């Protein structure tokens, strides 16, 4: 087995043969230790407080936020056999594949046929989020917006993979003259944000971030900082991904990162279970409308929840393997709480990264325990157990699940909890939803390359 593939599965492999630098004593980052001189203080300036006023998504459970969360609460699985292409020759033949997606009313037919699904999911989700924020196209509130202070920041881990794959195939089979003129524009990662901004006329900050499976949280963090610095009033932020195609599936198969439970795909994604054997691919988009409290109040916007803070950092350890000591993740959580003005004792819900991989699941749990000393008070669950791992879109969909847990008072189950690892002594909301009043919730997302990200949400209190 290739070393990187083995690391992706959490297996022990001999150290690489190339020379390493002489090890230096590691200094624990200051961020890894909570300040004890004073109690944390939340932001009070309405210009710097960031609230969530809209949500939109494309998912295996459809494109309606309430339906999406209702099906999560019911413990449904969206995982099943892949039928988008012939996957019979692959060792993994199932995924959280979106079926029956329709962008009618949101993307005109001519463009819809050309666009990569990654961009289609982005545009639909962004426009639905704006509608839920009272900023639908042509609305009075939309017309009155200062578009120079309205931005779009929707990232993707892999970009327009279908368009890229088709372009390469045309080049090989037919020559360069048969490459579509849309090949480059629709393959690059920034085009979803760009086309959404073009459609809605937003002229503020606009770009994409690509940090693998941490992408969405990085976008939320960056968007909030634009608002806090006074550079924008409102930003549509999140992530989108559409990688369930032959080259995407084949790539993750080559990493040996995927579950091969083809005989029972519904139970394949089983975070923290002793019998887990890899993650399940998913797809979709999850987008939030993030807005300064001052701006939201001026336009009498519907305030759903509050973004309290976040943090991003890097393990600086390995391309795919998490740090065994959990330092990167634990320090990221600590920094996010400091940014949010929250003490660890205030957090009582965690939407975990929890992908169902051998190494990743327990590494996250160990890091969480370094920050939260009383795990019995915390509910922790995995959205991926039902919809699969949506890669760059994962954090977006999981942020929506986190916010819905706040607004409904119910946390969705982690399904497929059959034989949990003994280290996992949190309440994982095993197999059945639970009523739970969320005080402060955090959502974790980590990506290949050692990218760590944590965002913090809470009920809005004026």
Curated annotation (Swiss-Prot):
Keyword tags: Acyltransferase, Chloroplast, Fatty acid biosynthesis, Fatty acid metabolism, Lipid biosynthesis, Lipid metabolism, Plastid, Transferase, Transit peptide
**UniProt superkingdom:** Eukaryota
The enzyme class is transferase
The UniProt GO MF terms for this protein read: 3-oxoacyl-[acyl-carrier-protein] synthase activity
Q: Where is it localised?
A: Plastid, Chloroplast
Question: Its principal location?
Answer: plastid
One Pfam family of this protein, by short name? Answer: ketoacyl-synt
Q: Where is the composition biased (Basic residues)?
A: 19-29
Q: Where is the active site?
A: 213, 353, 389
Annotated Ketosynthase family 3 (KS3) domain residues = 47-459
Q: Which reaction does it catalyse?
A: a fatty acyl-[ACP] + malonyl-[ACP] + H(+) = a 3-oxoacyl-[ACP] + holo-[ACP] + CO2
GO BP of this protein: fatty acid biosynthetic process
Q: Does the keyword Ion transport apply?
A: no
> Mind telling me where the transit peptide is?
1-35
Region spans: Disordered? 1-45
Q: Does this entry carry the keyword Lipid biosynthesis? A: yes
Listed under GO cellular component are:
chloroplast; mitochondrion
Which residue intervals are annotated with compositional bias (Low complexity) in the record? 30-39
Which EC number applies?
2.3.1.41
Oligomeric and partner information: Homodimer.
Record family assignment: Belongs to the thiolase-like superfamily. Beta-ketoacyl-ACP synthases family.
What does the UniProt record say this protein does? Answer: Catalyzes the condensation reaction of fatty acid synthesis by the addition to an acyl acceptor of two carbons from malonyl-ACP.
Put simply, this protein is called: 3-oxoacyl-[acyl-carrier-protein] synthase I, chloroplastic
